[in-house]
């Protein structure tokens, strides 16, 4: 990727959900380091675009191309997209009963470290960074030991996602209705 190339380039994207075409001829370029805001009416496809870019299997790409950091994003599965530096916050983050928050986030961080050729974080190093991130976001440290989003308020869910974002340090973050909850 040249410095002048966009980090994300979407060209003439068409997406179907079931029998319905939801996105028609969507094109956009997002430069690296840019803040890009996509606004539109309810039901106009903003969340669909984010979920499609993240690789959600419900959304079928019927045409167009998407390049992320110079690579064919559509050729990657959801995990490869995340490892490449793509992050999606959900409109309504799901509960994950039985999965401890600190273990879930550490696993994701270490998968990204591995994909970058970096050393995985041990529990001690990860916990130090996670505690700092939680404190900056006004989250009690005890949330790190709770199951992911289980029993969290709407605001706690969103701040928990922001903590994940801070710890993962993605190349591109799509924040879907970050103020909901």
Residue ranges of predicted features:
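ABC ATPase NBD Q-loop/coupling interface
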Residues: 65-81, 149
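The feature captures the beta-strand-to-loop junction immediately N-terminal to the Walker
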Residues: 39-44
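Conserved structural motif at the start of ABC-family nucleotide-binding domains
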Residues: 8-10, 23
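ABC-family P-loop ATPase nucleotide-binding domains
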Residues: 94-171
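Walker B catalytic motif
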Residues: 174-181
């Amino acid at each position: 990727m040249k410095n002048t190339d966009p980090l994300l380039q979407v060209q003439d994207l068409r997406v179907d959900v079931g029998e319905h075409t939801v996105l028609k001829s969507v094109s956009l370029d997002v430069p690296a380091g840019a803040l890009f805001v996509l606004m539109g009416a309810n039901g106009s496809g903003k969340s669909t675009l984010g979920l499609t870019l993240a690789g959600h299997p419900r959304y079928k790409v019927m045409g167009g191309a998407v390049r992320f950091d110079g690579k064919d994003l559509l050729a990657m599965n959801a995990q490869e997209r995340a490892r490449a530096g793509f992050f999606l916050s959900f409109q309504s983050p799901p509960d994950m009963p039985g999965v401890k928050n600190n273990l879930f986030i550490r696993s994701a961080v270490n998968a990204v470290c591995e994909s970058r050729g970096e050393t995985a974080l041990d529990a001690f190093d990860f916990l130090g960074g996670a505690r700092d991130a939680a404190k900056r976001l006004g989250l009690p440290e005890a949330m790190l030991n709770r199951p992911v989003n289980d029993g969290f308020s709407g605001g706690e869910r969103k701040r928990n996602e922001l903590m994940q974002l801070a710890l993962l340090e993605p190349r591109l973050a799509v924040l879907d209705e970050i103020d909901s909850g």
